[in-house]
């Protein structure tokens, strides 16, 4: 039989391929129609608690927080199954509960999440359990140099995309749970949850996030980078600092070398860089106002 160095799979828009290895060493390629496969578990009201974690506070609909017993890192449940089906994964079909939203038309069309194995695995997990966990705080560095999601520590900044992605993947990697740098689909699902639960309005998401994050023009603004969880007003559904303090790396991209930062930061006004804002920079750029979060994938 002739051997090929590579092969190409082609499909209509809305079809994605998931590649895995079978039990006998064979290669399995599954075609997934993400445009119509929109069935989510209704069990989002009972968030799963992975081994090694405990429930810390909150309910499923206002910020169910789990804490890792080993280091106190905390994550918040996002009940995707409770959201409206107005998101997209392919940029064309707005029929997903889990996906990006077009909050700001001027930015949306240029940026996308690559439909790779990691995102497709997360999609299947979200449908299975009805949601996902995101870090309650921006990721910081412990005294041992390990990533953590805890209160009262300076966010991990001056980090470029590749390192943020690598660091995020080391937070959890076992048979039950894996971690990764947040995708745009996950980021926007959090924003949609804020709107759905009526703790924030669309205008506060897309136009002006001044008063619920650390911005230059926030009332009594420190006008500098501050520790995670510094103010209660900057907490929404038990997630801290989502609107400001640092903007956050995501796995959104435009082209092969440019990645997308989400949200506002302490040097910018909240009406210029609201939480839904997107800014594209080179993946090896870094700054003292750029941080990141991590998301958990439950197998």
Regions found by a protein language model. Name each.
Residues 158-172, 177-182, 233, 254-299:
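Disulfide-stabilized, aromatic/cysteine-rich ligand-recognition loop
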Residues 84-93, 141-146, 257, 269-272:
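Short, solvent-exposed loop/turn elements at domain surfaces
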Residues 243-252:
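Active-site-proximal beta-strands of protease catalytic cores
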Residues 1-30:
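Short, low-complexity N-terminal tether/leader segments at secretion or assembly junctions of large
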Residues 23-88, 179:
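GGW-centered surface loops in extracellular recognition modules
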Residues 60, 71-72, 91, 96-241:
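Short aromatic-cysteine micro-motif
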Residues 81-83, 138-141, 251-256, 298-299:
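Acidic glycine-/aspartate-rich tracts in secreted/extracellular proteins
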């Amino acid at each position: 039989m002739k051997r090929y160095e590579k092969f190409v799979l082609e499909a209509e828009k809305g079809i994605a391929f998931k590649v895995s290895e079978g039990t006998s060493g064979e290669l399995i390629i599954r075609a997934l129609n993400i445009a119509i496969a929109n069935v989510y578990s209704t069990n989002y009201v009972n968030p799963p608690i992975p081994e090694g974690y405990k429930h810390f506070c909150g309910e499923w609909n206002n910020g169910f927080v789990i804490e890792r017993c080993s280091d106190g890192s905390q994550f918040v449940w996002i009940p995707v199954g409770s959201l409206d089906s107005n998101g997209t994964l392919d940029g064309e079909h707005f029929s997903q509960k889990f996906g990006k939203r077009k909050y700001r038309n001027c930015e949306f069309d240029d940026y996308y999440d690559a439909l790779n194995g990691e995102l497709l695995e997360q999609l299947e997990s979200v449908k299975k359990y009805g949601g996902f966990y995101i870090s309650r705080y921006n990721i910081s560095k412990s005294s041992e140099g390990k990533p953590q999601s805890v209160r009262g520590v300076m966010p991990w900044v001056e980090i470029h995309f590749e390192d943020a992605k690598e660091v995020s993947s080391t937070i959890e990697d076992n048979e039950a749970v894996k971690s990764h740098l947040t995708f745009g689909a996950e980021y926007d699902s959090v924003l949609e949850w804020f709107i759905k639960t009526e703790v924030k309005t669309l205008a506060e998401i897309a136009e002006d996030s001044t008063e619920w994050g650390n911005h230059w023009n926030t009332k009594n603004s420190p006008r500098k980078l501050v520790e995670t969880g510094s103010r209660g007003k900057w907490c929404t559904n038990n997630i801290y600092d989502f609107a400001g303090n640092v903007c956050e790396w995501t796995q959104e991209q435009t082209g092969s070398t440019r990645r997308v930062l989400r949200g506002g930061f302490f040097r910018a006004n909240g009406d210029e860089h609201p939480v839904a804002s997107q800014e594209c920079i080179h993946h090896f750029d870094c700054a003292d106002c750029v941080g990141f979060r991590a998301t958990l994938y439950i197998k």
